[in-house]
Amino acid sequence: MNEFVLEVKFVVKPESLALFNQLIDINAHASVEHEEGCYQFDVLRDSKDECQVLLYEVYKSEEAFADHMSRKHTQEFLAAAKPLIVSQTASRWTRYFAPKVKNV
């Protein structure tokens, strides 16, 4: 079965960045620690504009992603983050190939 990948790009209001960072930290950690089907949850920042945040999430399957979306921590993040962002876009992918990742 191919893994399901989600990329979400947020543009965060500058005055809300500190709170957004706290919220996404909680959500990312809860996702990888408590969801068996969440393999990866990376939070990336644009190197020139810290208000642009990219999430790179890898799940065992679309069903695992649906489980993620139903979780309390995800719902709380989405509700709390909504007033903090200027825009949000998402892209859904199927992982075709990935070489073995090195632990760093």
Positions of PLM-derived features:
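N-terminal first-folded block
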Residues: 4-34, 38-39
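Short, well-ordered beta-strand segments in beta-rich or mixed alpha/beta enzyme
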Residues: 4-11, 40-69
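Short flexible/disordered coil segments
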Residues: 8-9, 13, 71-72, 96-104
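Intrinsically disordered, low-complexity acidic/polar segments
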Residues: 17-19, 52, 64, 99
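An amphipathic, aromatic/His-enriched active-site/gating alpha helix that lines ligand/cofactor pockets
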Residues: 26-40, 58-91
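Glycine-rich beta-strand-turn "strand-cap" elements at beta-sheet edges
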Residues: 43-51, 78-104
